[in-house]
């Protein structure tokens, strides 16, 4: 009977470790992306120029605000 208890405890510990690791990794990535956003104003300016648009500061600010708003809603 002791072997079954040991096996059950090992399985429970593995599941708890997987869940804990997932939650810690998720929190770390959210914090990382908040501190280091994947796109910045300079990248937006370059993208708009490549698409043939003249990037005004107003357009860039609007796009950054929209992206930040969407990112905050997803979190």
UniProtKB/Swiss-Prot annotation:
Describe its membrane topology. Single-pass membrane protein
Transmembrane residue ranges: 3-23
Q: Known InterPro entries for this protein?
A: UPF0154 (IPR005359)
List, alphabetically, the Pfam families matched. UPF0154
Source domain of life is Bacteria
User: What does the entry list under GO cellular component?
Assistant: plasma membrane
- Predominant location of this chain? membrane
Keywords, sorted A to Z: Membrane, Transmembrane, Transmembrane helix
Give its localization: Membrane
The record's family statement is: Belongs to the UPF0154 family.
> Which HAMAP family does this chain map to?
UPF0154
UniProt name for this protein: UPF0154 protein SERP0914
UniProt organism field: Staphylococcus epidermidis (strain ATCC 35984 / DSM 28319 / BCRC 17069 / CCUG 31568 / BM 3577 / RP62A)
């Amino acid at each position: 009977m002791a072997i079954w208890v040991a096996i059950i405890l090992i399985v429970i510990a593995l599941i708890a470790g997987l869940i804990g690791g997932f939650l810690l990794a998720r929190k770390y990535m959210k914090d990382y992306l908040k501190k280091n956003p994947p796109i910045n104003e300079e990248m937006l300016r370059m993208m708009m120029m490549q698409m043939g648009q003249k990037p005004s500061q107003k357009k860039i600010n609007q796009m950054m605000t929209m992206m930040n708003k969407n990112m905050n809603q997803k979190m």
